[in-house]
C-alpha cells in the first residue's frame, strides 16, 4: 500500500483534530483544514431542532464582529432556509448541495433576496449529522462561486472523517446544548392573524401552502 504526501498530510491533520476535540477553537481548526482542500467564503456550525438554531461557532462579519445578516437569519429567516426545511421534513446524514434542497423558484424567495444573495451569494453545501430527538448537526460552507464537481467530490470523500469529528465534538458542547433553544417565531400565527382580519380562518392545508409559497415552492411543487 502506498500513500501520497497529500494522504499523509490529511491523516496527520485529522489526528491533530482528534487531539483538539475539547479545544475552544476546534471548529476553526476544522474549517481551516477543509479550506486547504476546498475554497469557501463563509461557514457556520449549528444545530437544527425544535426552536431556533443553536450556534456552536461561526465565521465573523466583515468588521470582525457578529454578522448582522446572520443575526437576522437566527431571528426568523432560517424558517425559509431550504436546508432547514429539508432537515425538518426529511432528516438524514450526508453531504447536501443547495441544488439538492432549493425549491424551483428559489431566487424569487424572500430568503434569497433578504439573506442568501447578500450573505452567502452563490452556493452553499452542508455536511449533516442526524442525531436523536429530531436534531441535525450541520456544518455549512458558503461560497461566492459555484462549487465545482471536483470540489464536491473532495468533500464527499472526506465527509465520513468530518462527520465523525463533528459527532464526537458534541460531547464538549454542553454550554450550547444545555441552553434551551428559543421558540420558533410564529410565521403560522402571523398567517392566521391576517386570515382573522379578513374574516376567513385558514385550514391546516392552507397554512402549509402558505409556508411552501414563502419558501419559494412553485405551484407544481405545492
What would you call each of these model-derived segments?
Residues 154-175, 219:
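Signal-transmission/dimerization alpha-helices at domain junctions
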Residues 13-17, 154, 179-190, 205:
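Hydrophobic helical signal-relay modules used by sensory signaling proteins
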Residues 166-186, 193:
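Short alpha-helical interdomain "coupling" segment at the junction between an upstream regulatory sensor module
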Residues 2-150, 154-160:
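Regulatory input/activation interfaces that engage signals or partners
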Amino acid at each position: 500500500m502506498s500513500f501520497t504526501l497529500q494522504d499523509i498530510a490529511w491523516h496527520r491533520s485529522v489526528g491533530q483534530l482528534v487531539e483538539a476535540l475539547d479545544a475552544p477553537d476546534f471548529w476553526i481548526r476544522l474549517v481551516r483544514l477543509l479550506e486547504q482542500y476546498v475554497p469557501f467564503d463563509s461557514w457556520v456550525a449549528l444545530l437544527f431542532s425544535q426552536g431556533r438554531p443553536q450556534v456552536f461557532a461561526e465565521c465573523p462579519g466583515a468588521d470582525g464582529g457578529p454578522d448582522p445578516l446572520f443575526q437576522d437569519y437566527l431571528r426568523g429567516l432560517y424558517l425559509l432556509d431550504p436546508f432547514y426545511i429539508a432537515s425538518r421534513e426529511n432528516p438524514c446524514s450526508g453531504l447536501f448541495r443547495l441544488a439538492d434542497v432549493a425549491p424551483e423558484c428559489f431566487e424569487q424567495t424572500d430568503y434569497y433576496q433578504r439573506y442568501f444573495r447578500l450573505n452567502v451569494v452563490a452556493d452553499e453545501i452542508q455536511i449533516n449529522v442526524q442525531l436523536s430527538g429530531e436534531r441535525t448537526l450541520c456544518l455549512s460552507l458558503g461560497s461566492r462561486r459555484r462549487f465545482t464537481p471536483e470540489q464536491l467530490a473532495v468533500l464527499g470523500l472526506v465527509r465520513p472523517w468530518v462527520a465523525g469529528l463533528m459527532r464526537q465534538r458534541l460531547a464538549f458542547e454542553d454550554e450550547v446544548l444545555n441552553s434551551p433553544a428559543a421558540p420558533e417565531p410564529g410565521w403560522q400565527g402571523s398567517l392566521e392573524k391576517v386570515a382573522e382580519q379578513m374574516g376567513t380562518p385558514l385550514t391546516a392545508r392552507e397554512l402549509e401552502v402558505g409556508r411552501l409559497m414563502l419558501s419559494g415552492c412553485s405551484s407544481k411543487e405545492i
